[in-house]
């Protein structure tokens, strides 16, 4: 079976991250059912039962990997497979979005005020300008951290203040930039111009956000999501915000919340956030304040 699994994974036109997840799922499948197990409904059910202690999201990834493998091998009775999937699937309950808005806004305010001293070293000045531009980009565009770190300078249409990106699910989308995020990016890139003459990479192909640590020296090297999150957490400490109070995805939550509060239009927020389903955006509806106002009218104002 392992030979077939390797053949299956080699044919997949998916991201490296997805292939890694599928490989892990299929290795777990082999460990559970055995390398010589027949690819039938009974084997599939045995695997589903073994997943009961895992989270709904993990179960979904594992099921998808195994079902695609069955399809690749042209194995299994598909009506029975569908019925077994429905019977043994643990449904995940809907969760509303909850984040510490006050802490996020404190981090945003601190990063927006970053203005390095002229006497600071070049790397420190560039790091401060980069971190300011990065945080403002996250909160004003709704980009995921991986999407922001993947941006190239040539991706930005500076006149229209937008970029066309390849986002989640390998889908192309238009992302709009605010005036302040564009200004912060331009200030950062202008300061970085003293480094770029040493680069052999064409300007349009250079990363929008780069490393400026000692190991990077004066070369233009892209910064990873992990490296950028580490930098933001350091800014959180400087802003006296507990690192556990803000998660990296909270900046995206903040973006969606602000768009909904400003317009009260879930469909518009869905489009700007690039959510595939309106049900995802609907998790932010409790921020609208209508229920709060009604509750206050019923239980508080009558007591005054």
Description of each model-found segment:
Residues 1-304:
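Conserved catalytic core of the tyrosine transesterase superfamily
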């Amino acid at each position: 079976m392992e030979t077939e699994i390797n053949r299956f994974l080699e044919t997949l036109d998916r991201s490296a991250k997805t292939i890694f997840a599928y490989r892990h799922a299929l290795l777990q499948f082999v460990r559970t059912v055995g390398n010589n197990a027949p690819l039938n409904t009974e084997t599939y059910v045995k695997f589903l039962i073994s997943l009961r202690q895992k989270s709904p999201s993990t179960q979904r990834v594992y099921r998808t990997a195994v079902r695609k493998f069955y399809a690749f091998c042209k194995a299994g009775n598909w009506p029975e497979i569908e019925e077994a999937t429905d019977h043994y699937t643990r449904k995940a309950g809907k969760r509303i979005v909850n984040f510490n808005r006050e802490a996020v806004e404190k981090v945003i305010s601190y990063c927006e005020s970053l203005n390095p001293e002229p006497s600071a070293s070049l790397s420190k000045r560039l790091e401060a300008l980069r971190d300011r531009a990065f945080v403002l980009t996250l909160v004003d565009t709704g980009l995921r951290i991986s999407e922001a770190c993947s941006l190239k300078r040539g991706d930005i249409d500076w006149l229209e203040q937008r970029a066309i990106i390849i986002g989640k699910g390998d889908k192309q989308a238009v992302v709009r930039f605010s005036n302040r995020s564009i200004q912060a990016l331009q200030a950062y890139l202008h300061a970085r111009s003293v480094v770029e003459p040493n680069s052999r990479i064409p300007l349009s192909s250079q990363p929008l956000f780069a490393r400026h640590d000692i190991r990077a020296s004066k070369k233009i090297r892209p910064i990873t999501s992990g490296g950028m999150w580490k930098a933001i957490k350091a800014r959180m400490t400087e802003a006296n915000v507990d690192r556990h109070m803000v998660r990296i995805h909270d900046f995206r939550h903040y973006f969606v919340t602000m768009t909904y509060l400003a317009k009260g239009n879930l469909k518009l927020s869905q489009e700007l956030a690039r959510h595939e389903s309106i049900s995802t955006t609907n998790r932010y509806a409790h921020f609208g304040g209508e229920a709060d106002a009604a509750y206050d009218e019923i239980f508080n104002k009558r007591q005054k």
